[in-house]
């Protein structure tokens, strides 16, 4: 689903536009000028549905070069092993989330809690996957002609990242699950989730220019993206 030139929504579950598997997070693809990058990979139960959306949007799997992983919860990283094997792409994430993804242990990922709540079926298992490049909060790097800056998303997960992407004169903020539409946050009884962590990460986003707001679930915003960050900060008393 094309959002604007060089930016597509290629996966989304029941909490969003329901393009692919019911439990999938929002999966985005953007053109770097030297291949496409995915942001997150969905839950991995039917990852071919995301590949089908890519191809339906005219994006060849052979042109997908990167996967920016915001965090290693199952609905975001479960499809990563499939895409790495099929596309041969480079997985980029933080050191902490890379370790969680490589081990894929239910209790580390909060899957035991999520299964108990009924969010995941009991037989769900995320496939472990190795990251290829480790990045850190405060780091900026280039993918083709696109600049990517890393911001903390700690508070939702132990080492989660938001990615601020400068593309064609616009700034795109991929928040993972740190903030969703209208500044909502999600406090859960899973490792690394904390109110204080949310406060620190959201406060750090205060200086960022945000045109387009692209969360891991639910509605996104093609204009006035910074307002969603500001609403989160206001709700936390920042």
Label the model's feature ranges.
Residues 45-48, 55-139, 231-234:
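Active-site HxH/HxHxD metal-binding segment of metal-dependent hydrolases
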Residues 7-15, 119-123, 144-148:
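Short Pro/Gly-enriched beta-strand edge/turn motifs at strand-loop
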Residues 1-57, 162-176:
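Conserved beta-strand hairpin/beta-sheet module of binuclear metal-dependent hydrolase folds
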Residues 33-36, 60-64, 144:
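Short, surface-exposed connector motifs at secondary-structure boundaries
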Residues 44-45, 140, 147-236:
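Metallo-beta-lactamase
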Residues 37-39, 68, 91, 172-174, ...:
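Residue-level marker for buried hydrophobic side chains located in beta-strands
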């Amino acid at each position: 689903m094309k959002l604007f030139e060089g930016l597509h929504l290629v996966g989304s579950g029941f909490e969003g536009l329901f393009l692919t598997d019911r439990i999938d997070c929002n999966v985005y693809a953007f053109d770097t000028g030297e291949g496409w990058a995915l942001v997150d990979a969905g839950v991995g139960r039917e990852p071919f549905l995301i590949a089908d959306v890519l191809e339906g949007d005219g994006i060849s799997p052979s042109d997908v070069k990167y996967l920016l992983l915001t965090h290693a919860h199952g609905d975001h990283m479960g499809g990563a092993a499939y895409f790495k094997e099929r596309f041969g792409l480079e997985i980029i994430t933080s050191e902490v989330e890379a370790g969680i993804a490589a081990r894929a242990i239910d209790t580390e990922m909060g899957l035991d809690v999520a299964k108990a709540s009924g969010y995941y079926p009991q037989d769900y298992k995320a496939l472990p996957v190795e990251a290829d490049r480790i990045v850190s909060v405060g780091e900026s790097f280039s993918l083709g002609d696109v600049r990517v800056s890393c911001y903390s998303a700690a508070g939702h997960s132990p080492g989660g990242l938001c990615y601020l992407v400068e593309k064609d004169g616009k700034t795109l903020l991929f928040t993972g699950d740190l903030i969703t539409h209208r500044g909502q946050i999600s406090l859960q009884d899973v490792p690394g989730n904390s109110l204080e962590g949310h406060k620190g990460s959201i406060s750090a986003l205060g200086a960022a220019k945000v045109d387009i707001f692209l969360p891991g679930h639910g509605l996104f915003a093609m204009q006035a993206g910074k307002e969603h960050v500001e609403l989160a900060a206001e709700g936390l008393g920042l």
